[in-house]
Amino acid sequence: MAELSISSLESLTLKGLYEKAKEYKVSYYAKLTKKELIFAILKAQAEKDGFLFMDGILEIIPSEGFGFLRPINYSPSAEDIYISASQIRRFDLRNGDKVSGKVRPPKENERYYGLLHVDAVNGEDPEIAKERVHFPALTPLYPDRLMSLETETKKVSTRIIDLMTPVGFGQRGLIVAPPKAGKTMLLKQIANSISANHPDTKLIILLVDERPEEVTDIERSVHPDVDVVSSTFDEVPENHIKVSELVLERAMRLVEHKKDVVILMDSITRLARAYNLVIPPSGRTLSGGIDPAAFHRPKRFFGAARNIEEGGSFTILATALVDTGSRMDDVIYEEFKGTGNMELHLDRSLAERRIYPAIDILKSGTRKEELLVSKSHLDKIWAIRKTMQDSPDFVERFLRRMRASKNNEEFFQNMEEDMKRKGTARR
């Protein structure tokens, strides 16, 4: 029987794939998408030949040239698959590539599975993957496509973001969060809105130095297709860095394939703290005890977010911790403050009064928002901002009015009617 490849299967019609699926006894093949069906057939063929069909995220060992595919949480595990230097060179594989193929179990004196044949790279034919442009050569642009987050009437948080701090594909956003202001809840709502409104977007949630129970909570709260990658507080700082950098490389590889990628990160502050513990001391120290050299690599991570002229985008929304009682955290926030093109501030005083979402609408905003929303929409946003007051009572009234409207469009209509009534009353 002829060896199947991803390219030969992609050239078949759905009817042809169904015939192959019957031949290889693939279950429930009619319910699968074309992509899922191709991988199910490849897996069935590998098992028929006495092998396994596995995939993982590639991490190349720099000094050796070979690498390992990490199938579990982007981290080393007993399930890792060895991939030779010759396979990496042949297909121009890079850190963060998702490599799929036939795998043999470890032999008597071996620790790892061995990759026999590369069948797919990031879901594409390996020969096509060789031709892609490297991420640094892609042209960065301001975000110009709105990432709509509005879903249900009750989900006011995401409706406010759409109104006052619109997020575009390729946004580099900071969520500035004091303790107990509802940042985890907000991240979950943003994640679920992206999954609902933009199912083709690849979403990764990266949790650095977080509590293990919080990781479980987020895993159970989001869509199954979302990658929740974590390095909890009981791991060493080196692990925080390793996992974060592999997630970054993964996102870059997908953007090279012209995909839209979103990373929701909690938090950039803790990643910077991890780098501060690991990097060789430069001999200089900023206020709070942080080494200036510790900022370079977290800034490289955050700075990778961009809209791409050639197609695809890379969005990062990262939390920055403030008012924690640590001077270091404030210095880290000040250092990242000017690097983003969108900021969403959470207000502790609102959270203490149990006013949720505790968003400080006055301080929050997006650069170049005119590229994301229409002129009429922008005029309405500016009209709202002109009437704003820096008080919890105003925010409470604003939230009450939002909940009274079904969606943002209705909220705008109600606001226009109010302004007309006030204008008539003045006359």
Could you describe each region identified by the protein language model?
Residues D55, I83-S86, K102-P105, G114, ...:
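Short beta-alpha junctions and helix-cap segments that line functional grooves
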Residues G173, A181-T184, Q189-R427:
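P-loop NTPase catalytic core
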Residues I41-K43, I60-P62, P71-N73, A85, ...:
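Flexible glycine-/small-residue-rich
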Residues K35-A129:
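N-terminal "pre-motor" subdomain/linker immediately upstream of P-loop NTPase catalytic cores
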Residues G50-M54, V156-I160, V247-E249:
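Phosphate-interacting basic helix/loop segments used at nucleotide- and nucleic-acid interfaces
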Residues M1-D49:
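Basic helix-extension-helix modules of the SAP/HeH family
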Residues S5, T13-G16, E64, S195, ...:
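OB-fold/S1-family RNA-binding modules
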Residues L93, P106-I175:
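P-loop NTP-binding catalytic core
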